[in-house]
Amino acid sequence: MSGHSKWATIKRKKAATDQKRGSLFTKLVKEITIAAKMGGGDPTGNPRLRLAIDTARANSMPMDNIQRAIKRGTGELEGATYEEITYEGYGPGGIAIIIETATDNRNRTVADIRHLMSRGGGSLGESGSVGWMFKRKGSIEVPRSAISEDDLMELLLDAGLEELESDDEQYFTVLTDVKDLEPVKKALEEAGIPFENAKIDMIPDNYVELDVENARKALKLIDALENSDDVQAVYSNMDMSESVMSVLEEE
């Protein structure tokens, strides 16, 4: 299984046991607000907002919450002004980590991130220190039960499919150029094919395989970062063997 597929599997299992819906809603509200501020409140002409709304609805966010977040972004309602800041650094075992934040207090956020990284066996680096190791891509998960690999590839080739990962037991992972994420989603919707977790992802060019101890530390660090109120997303180039993954799943 590829490093990206393993990480996707771990993330799904984390999400299945994560009860912090309030924290998730906070992050989604920030993303909707920022998207509306940057590109306007009409999702038909704002792909980032459309994706944020789709993600919020997939996570059962009430429409009233979504509309209020949009209006805060467009200035129709008063609210906090968020600044997007990306931090880069290294984690246990030398893995590269990218941390995307949305904050109304830059000083608070950088202090929190630095503390979490230091406590978790990592360190903050300068801007650009690890970003060059990743490429921004569109990512969609399609249940294997919904369609065959050949049919999925045929369906999406003209829509913008770049790569189809098929080594996960439950899901195909569709990777696209960022600009082709919406056309690929539309092709799936029009064909009646269910999908999950449509998002913009950061895919590493290469992975760093960790032993059990460092993998455990890295997962704990990433979990702590993701639970920070100001953190929107965390990406890494962590990989692990099937045996290490099995050990961690049993814990």
Curated annotation (Swiss-Prot):
What Gene Ontology cellular-component terms does the record carry? cytosol
Query: A single Gene Ontology molecular function, please?
Result: DNA binding
Q: In which compartments does the protein localize?
A: Cytoplasm
* Keyword line: Cytoplasm, DNA-binding, Transcription, Transcription regulation
Asked whether the keyword DNA-binding is assigned, the reply is yes
Cite the Pfam families for this sequence. TACO1_YebC_N, Transcrip_reg
One BP term from GO:
regulation of DNA-templated transcription
Q: State the family named in the UniProt similarity comment for this chain.
A: Belongs to the TACO1 family.
Q: What HAMAP family would the database entry show?
A: Transcrip_reg_TACO1
What PANTHER family does the entry give? Answer: TRANSCRIPTIONAL REGULATORY PROTEIN YEBC-RELATED, TRANSLATIONAL ACTIVATOR OF CYTOCHROME C OXIDASE 1
The protein's name: Probable transcriptional regulatory protein CT1665
Q: Which organism is it from?
A: Chlorobaculum tepidum (strain ATCC 49652 / DSM 12025 / NBRC 103806 / TLS) (Chlorobium tepidum)
* Species classification: Bacteria, Pseudomonadati, Chlorobiota, Chlorobiia, Chlorobiales
